[in-house]
UniProtKB/Swiss-Prot annotation:
Main location: plastid
Membrane topology label: Multi-pass membrane protein
PANTHER family, sorted: CALCIUM UNIPORTER PROTEIN 3, MITOCHONDRIAL, CALCIUM UNIPORTER PROTEIN, MITOCHONDRIAL
Purpose of the protein: Chloroplastic membrane calcium uniporter that mediates calcium uptake into chloroplast stroma. Constitutes a pore-forming and calcium-conducting subunit. Chloroplastic calcium homeostasis plays key roles in cellular physiology. Promotes calcium uptake into chloroplast stroma in response to osmotic-stress, fine-tuning cytosolic MAPK3/MAPK6 phosphorylation and affecting stomata opening.
Keywords in alphabetical order: Calcium, Calcium channel, Calcium transport, Chloroplast, Ion channel, Ion transport, Membrane, Metal-binding, Plastid, Transit peptide, Transmembrane, Transmembrane helix, Transport
Reaction catalysed by this enzyme: Ca(2+)(in) = Ca(2+)(out)
Name by which UniProt lists this protein: Chloroplastic calcium uniporter protein
C-alpha cells in the first residue's frame, strides 16, 4: 500500500512540473472538442492520463494554438526594429542617355525621309557610273516610293544638298571628282613665290605712294599759281575800268576774255574727255605730273599693276594710276 502511494506521489509531482511548463508556452488551455470530462474523475487520474512524455519532440500546435503562435509572431515582428526603414531613401534614377522622349509625328517623318535618302544614295553608288541621264536619276530616286512626285522631290533634295550635280539633262553622281578636276585647272601660287611677290609689291607700293605725293604737291602749286593769276587779272581790270579807261572800253575786252576762257575749257574737254571743272583740271594735271615722275624715276608701273591685281584684287580703283 505504501509503494502505491509513493508511486502516485511521484507521478503527481512529474505531472505538476510539466503542466507548469506547458502553461508558460500556451496563453490559454485548448478546449477539447471531444467528450466533456467526468466530474467524478479525480485530478490525479486526469493528470496521469494526460501527462506528456519525458522527451516529446517539438510538434507544431494545431487549432487555436497555431493561431495564437502566428499572432504572437506578428506582434513580435511589428515591435522589432526595421533596419530597412532607417536606410536613406533611394536616389532618383537618372535618365540614362539611351532614354528617348516620346517621338512625335514630325520626328517619324524626318526619320523616314532620312532613311529614304540613305537608300537612294546607296542605290546610286551601286550604279558605278559618274554620269547618268536625269530621267534615270529620277527613276532611281522614286523606286522606294509609290508616289511618282516623290522621285522629283528626292532628286531636288539631293541636288540642293550637293550630293549630286545636275547639269542640264545629265547628273554627276560623284561631284567630288568634278570639283577636284576643276580645282586642278585653277592656278595657285606656291607659298615661297607668293611671299617673294608680296615683298616686291610692298616695295613698289612705297615708291608709288611717294610719286603720288610729289605729283599732288606739284599740282597744288600750279592751282595756287592759277588763283594768283586770276586775282591779278581781276585787280587789273578793276583799275582799267575805273581809273585808266572807261566801262565802254573795258566791256568788249571783258567779253572777249570770257570767250577765251570758254574756248579753253572746250578745248580741255576735247583733249581729256573730262568735264571742264576745277576737279577735272586737277585730275588731268595730276595724271600728267604722275606720268612724268614715273618716267623720270624709271618706275615699272605695269609690274606694279599686275602685283596689285594679284594681292589686292578687291581694291577699288581710283582715277589715279
Amino acid at each position: 500500500m505504501s509503494s502505491k502511494k509513493s508511486l502516485v506521489q511521484s507521478l503527481f509531482n512529474i505531472s505538476k512540473t510539466y503542466s507548469r511548463i506547458s502553461g508558460l508556452t500556451r496563453m490559454r488551455p485548448t478546449k477539447s472538442g471531444g467528450i466533456p470530462p467526468d466530474a467524478g474523475d479525480s485530478g490525479i487520474r486526469r493528470r496521469f492520463l494526460h501527462k506528456r512524455a519525458f522527451f516529446s519532440p517539438e510538434i507544431v500546435p494545431k487549432g487555436g494554438n497555431l493561431m495564437e503562435k502566428l499572432r504572437e509572431l506578428t506582434l513580435s515582428n511589428n515591435n522589432r526594429i526595421r533596419l530597412d526603414e532607417m536606410l536613406p531613401p533611394p536616389s532618383p534614377k537618372k535618365s540614362s542617355p539611351e532614354f528617348f522622349p516620346a517621338v512625335t509625328v514630325e520626328d517619324v517623318k524626318k526619320l523616314m525621309r532620312a532613311a529614304e535618302m540613305e537608300l537612294v544614295k546607296s542605290k546610286l553608288r551601286e550604279i558605278g557610273k559618274n554620269w547618268v541621264p536625269y530621267s534615270e536619276f529620277v527613276r532611281v530616286c522614286g523606286e522606294y516610293s509609290s508616289d511618282p512626285e516623290q522621285g522629283n522631290r528626292v532628286a531636288n533634295m539631293l541636288d540642293e544638298a550637293g550630293n549630286v550635280i545636275v547639269l542640264g539633262k545629265l547628273v554627276c553622281l560623284k561631284p567630288e571628282e568634278l570639283t577636284s578636276a576643276m580645282a586642278g585647272l585653277i592656278p595657285t601660287l606656291e607659298p615661297s613665290l607668293d611671299a617673294e611677290t608680296r615683298q616686291e609689291f610692298e616695295q613698289l607700293e612705297i615708291i608709288k605712294s611717294d610719286i603720288d605725293k610729289r605729283a599732288d604737291d606739284l599740282v597744288r602749286k600750279e592751282l595756287w599759281a592759277g588763283l594768283g593769276l586770276i586775282m591779278a587779272q581781276t585787280v587789273g581790270f578793276f583799275r582799267l575800268t575805273f581809273w585808266e579807261l572807261s566801262w565802254d572800253v573795258m566791256e568788249p575786252i571783258c567779253f572777249y576774255v570770257t570767250s577765251t576762257y570758254f574756248m579753253a575749257g572746250y578745248a580741255f574737254f576735247l583733249r581729256t574727255s573730262k568735264e571742264p571743272s576745277f576737279e577735272g583740271f586737277y585730275k588731268s594735271r595730276f595724271e600728267t605730273k604722275q606720268k612724268r615722275l614715273i618716267k623720270m624715276l624709271d618706275f615699272d608701273i605695269d609690274r606694279f599693276t599686275k602685283l596689285q591685281k594679284m594681292h589686292r584684287p578687291n581694291l577699288t580703283k581710283s582715277g589715279r594710276c
